[in-house]
């Protein structure tokens, strides 16, 4: 450990001997300060104009979409590659790497020392953000400190992940510009990989987990999830290990297939860990917000605890339904995200998808196309969207499984307990078609409680009891029983 600390100390000195480290700190402080001052001045203007005090000042000033932490987080990728591009490239170009190889220092110590230097530099960047926290603590009543600490943890983990990626890229070449560009390319790939191969089972879960996009926003929202912590740990560990392997292959001669086998093996191990830890049964959560904003309501928790047997949630997707694109395989992980707050309290819940085509009162087609036979409509959509027709059950096949005619054969969730109790959870018309916490809780509650007797008053302008539009909110029964 002493050797690692010495290397880190030397690396920090080299950082601050050049103007880049100082310049980055100054620009970072200026950017973070301007973001904070803009939001703070807007709140002062509201107060001066008599608009009253807006609640949730912790989120508005620091962690919300207009907060300084959020804006800083979106720009971190601009700073870290400028620092990491010289970590190992400088050793290659100056020839000092030969001195390191001939000295009694291991490859792990070299990589560990340089990464520790980046961790310490990242700590200096957090100190700048802590100054804003101190200022907010003075002027904001009841500041949510645990929420802020969660946000700072997320930012720091992103800094460390970017540093590990940049360090690995710097071991590949002596050209610093190539390292910086390569780091940006890797970061871009990690941000967009979550949208790749989402129509392939298992692979969709791996690429979704591998995506870096939005990881830190979970922390800034105040929710610390073991999946996200493990993700950053695996990414950091993977790229540091790849860096050590690269130095070993430089010192010792290995055949090309053995080098690639070692790299591939480490990547497979990392993906395997990620796949396992992304399963709900292996997840742990800690909601740091004072109001438990990231946790379902107490009533929702009570309902989930009452379901003491196997719960199965099946999504029935009618290809001819307007809402069908939201239920296609490429959107399965997005749908899982909506259910995740409930799966937190019952991680053994089974999720299933059934795809079919049938007549519906919510059809994609209008005019002459809508009069075509159902199979021809299905084939037309499959041809337009490059889908396999054999993937969808025919009307006769789906009718043998379930009768959805009472729901207009629309896309719908079926919630089913092992004791046989069932409940439908609908999708709706409009911009936001997915059911939210209130609607999900109501559907789950029907699995654990008997139907109540409801009396309606009519004849005084009330909404109609008999309106039967499943996707609308025009009738009172649809509004309260979504």
Positions of the model-derived regions?
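Hydrophobic alpha-helical transmembrane segments of multi-pass membrane transport/permease proteins
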Residues: 19-44, 71-80, 185-189
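Secretory targeting signals
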Residues: 34-37, 55-74, 112-174
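Short, surface-exposed patches at the edges or C-terminal ends of soluble domains, predominantly
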Residues: 44, 199, 217-220, 226, ...
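Aromatic- and glycine-rich beta-strand/loop motifs that create alpha-glucan
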Residues: 1-25
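Long, hydrophobic alpha-helical segments
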Residues: 64-90
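Terminal transmembrane helical anchor/hairpin motif
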Residues: 39-63, 172, 179-180, 185-252
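Transmembrane helix boundary and interhelical loop/hinge segments in multi-pass membrane proteins
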Residues: 81-101, 115
